């Protein structure tokens, strides 16, 4: 388990699937992520079994440190040990957004990526209309690295994707502040 002051990250478990399906099927927020909605428990179980065998991915449940309540999920995908990079993802249940918990979870997973996996670069993309996510990742130290035009199809139209990245050296400087 990776522990912080307010949140901890533990390996994603099968009993986390039911909460995950509810969160992913929330139309209000689900349209901001690049996936087909709705999803089913069966589909999420299949995802869980596949990702648990995938050597290029790590998935975590985000839990409150004080009582271990499951409040979200995060992870790394497309881990490339040769080039020492990976793609990060995160989502929190609505009631926990805006409390600094997501930032703490991102910090924990970046520590894991840079200090345990010895990766050098972590990246992600955000739909250009998701302004709160853009602000969030910038506050976490990610840098805007460019735009892929019409990269994602959402709500019956194409949206641009903004790519963000953070290097180990940048993260190490942020930790000293």
Predicted regions and their residues:
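Acetyl-CoA-dependent GNAT
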Residues: 39-97, 167-171
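Conserved active-site tyrosine of GNAT-family acetyltransferases
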Residues: 137, 142, 164
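Terminal substrate-recognition subdomain of acyl/acetyltransferases
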Residues: 157-177
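Conserved acetyl-CoA-binding loop-helix of GNAT-fold acetyltransferases
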Residues: 92, 98-112, 134-139
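Glycine-rich acetyl-CoA-binding "A-motif" of GNAT/NAT acetyltransferases
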Residues: 68-72, 132, 158
